[in-house]
Structures are given as structure tokens and as C-alpha cells.
């Protein structure tokens, strides 16, 4: 199967539970949602085989691989996850949660969008990009970890205030942007 890849790069995870972890990011092209705050060019990309993806990922020393996008669930299947596991990788995904995922993914970060129906039931962490919306509906999701991330620097104080009022949540900043890395 050919998969449309926007880019593959090595950096530190800058958000959520695994913040600070060295990881290889596989950014897939395309998304089934059109979020106003999204900072990713979704359509650009190169079609790659699993062999090409594994070869690229294997150039870096990290054990952790993060599937991101766009929306990676548009392009992944059990075969790719199995290949990554065979290469000794711990596979994480950052998804909007609208489409089913291979069960063998090691860590699922769901970033649900208000009013959008979820297509997954397993998630290890929930990350909400906060714009002042009611977060109580997200607290019902079956996750162990809950993160609020400011939509922009302009609403960081609003996000901090929300976390202080809702101690189930933790603050997630885009630390990769704060320290000026990818």
C-alpha cells in the first residue's frame, strides 16, 4: 500500500504526556476535518511504501514513533503498525478520533473536536485545543490523562484558569515552539 506522507522528521515531542521524549514523527497528508486553528499543510506529500517509511524511520535513534497529520487514520493499517513494531518501535498516534484505528497502536492521543462524533473507544490521553469551550463533555471520555492546550498565546491565561478550576486536566504547551525546534 502506498501512503501519502507530508514529512518524516526527528525531534522531541512537544505536547501532552510524552513531552520531551525523542521521537520520529511521521506526518501524514490529508484530513477529514477543517479546523480553523490547524497549522499543518495537509495536502502536500509524497507517496511512500512501507519499506521506504521504515528505512526513513530507521535513520534515527528514537524508539518512539509518532503518527500525526493531517489525520493519520486515513492512511494507516495493521500492516504498517506491525512493520514499525518489528523495527522495535513504540507507536503513538495523534488523531481526531473520528475513524477506527488498528488495535496494536501502543499509545492513542485523541484530540476530539466539539460536535464531531468519535469513531474510537480506546484512548490513553485526551488533548483539547482550548478556545474557551465547555470541557465537561470531554471528561466522560475513557482516557487516563487529560490535557488542555491553548489555541494561541492570546488565550494561555484562559487555559491556565480552566485547568486550575478543573484539576482532572493538565496544561500542555507546545514546548517545541517555545524552545524553537521542530
UniProtKB/Swiss-Prot annotation:
Q: Could you tell me which residue ranges the Radical SAM core domain spans? A: 18-182
Q: What domain of life does the UniProt record list for this protein's source?
A: Bacteria
The reaction(s) catalysed by this protein are: 6-carboxy-5,6,7,8-tetrahydropterin + H(+) = 7-carboxy-7-deazaguanine + NH4(+)
Q: Where does Mg(2+) bind?
A: 40
The record's Gene3D superfamilies line, in alphabetical order, gives: Aldolase class I
For the ligand ([4Fe-4S] cluster), the binding residues are: 31, 35, 38
Q: In which pathway does it act?
A: Purine metabolism; 7-cyano-7-deazaguanine biosynthesis
The cofactor remark states: Binds 1 [4Fe-4S] cluster. The cluster is coordinated with 3 cysteines and an exchangeable S-adenosyl-L-methionine. Binds 1 S-adenosyl-L-methionine per subunit.
Stored SUPFAM superfamilies: Radical SAM enzymes (SSF102114)
Q: Name one GO biological process term.
A: queuosine biosynthetic process
Gene Ontology molecular-function annotations: 4 iron, 4 sulfur cluster binding; carbon-nitrogen lyase activity; magnesium ion binding; S-adenosyl-L-methionine binding
**Per the UniProt record, which EC number(s) apply here?**
4.3.99.3
* Entry cofactors: [4Fe-4S] cluster; S-adenosyl-L-methionine; Mg(2+)
Task: Give the EC class as a word.
Answer: lyase
Residue sites binding substrate per the record: 12-14, 27, 68
Record's keyword terms, sorted: 4Fe-4S, Iron, Iron-sulfur, Lyase, Magnesium, Metal-binding, Queuosine biosynthesis, S-adenosyl-L-methionine
Binding-site residues for S-adenosyl-L-methionine, renumbered to this chain: 70, 111-113
Q: Which PANTHER family match?
A: 7-CARBOXY-7-DEAZAGUANINE SYNTHASE
Q: How does it assemble?
A: Homodimer.
* Role, per record: Catalyzes the complex heterocyclic radical-mediated conversion of 6-carboxy-5,6,7,8-tetrahydropterin (CPH4) to 7-carboxy-7-deazaguanine (CDG), a step common to the biosynthetic pathways of all 7-deazapurine-containing compounds.
**Hey, which family's this protein in?**
Belongs to the radical SAM superfamily. 7-carboxy-7-deazaguanine synthase family.
For this entry, the protein name equals 7-carboxy-7-deazaguanine synthase
Lineage runs: Bacteria, Pseudomonadati, Bacteroidota, Bacteroidia, Bacteroidales
Gene it is expressed from: queE
